[in-house]
């Protein structure tokens, strides 16, 4: 029996896995998330997702003398409009990001990586969703940033929380904007013999 491991401390990703009924444990990775290789956004999120998953796969692979089989899920999300935006560094950075996104379309990219500790077979993929932000007044931006909600989110907003009122429309997977594209993840899990709709 394979055991699912989520290589992420994101509460949103945990909630999404619970939503589709997966049993899993959380093991955090210790990787550097900087873009030292100057990769394009779609490459970067897959690269970081893989690094997270690989780091955690190495940690859990030797449990029980390697008798247990683990399927490690790594993910990384960025927002892209002219540049790559991760989580804001501070309050001012969050304000700058929201002003940059105001009144325009941007892309949310989530890279996913799965690694099977049995043979370290891996697969990576990326999901892209387009999001149109409303025209935001300075007062709205400052009030939203003051909620502290943006500080741990790529692009400085959370579509599943108060940030929902900032969004005009989206094209593509909503769950991708939250942090984990569930349809794409389900397809990847099938490649490793795991069905969301059937008990493992």
Swiss-Prot record:
It catalyses: dTTP + H2O = dTMP + diphosphate + H(+); UTP + H2O = UMP + diphosphate + H(+). Nucleoside triphosphate pyrophosphatase that hydrolyzes dTTP and UTP. May have a dual role in cell division arrest and in preventing the incorporation of modified nucleotides into cellular nucleic acids. It comes from the Bacteria. Its main location: cytoplasm. This is dTTP/UTP pyrophosphatase. One of its GO terms (cellular component) is cytoplasm. Its cofactor is a divalent metal cation. The keyword Hydrolase applies. Belongs to the Maf family. YhdE subfamily. Keywords: Cytoplasm, Hydrolase, Nucleotide metabolism. It is found in: Cytoplasm. Pfam families: Maf. The active site is at residue 76. It comes from Acetivibrio thermocellus (strain ATCC 27405 / DSM 1237 / JCM 9322 / NBRC 103400 / NCIMB 10682 / NRRL B-4536 / VPI 7372).
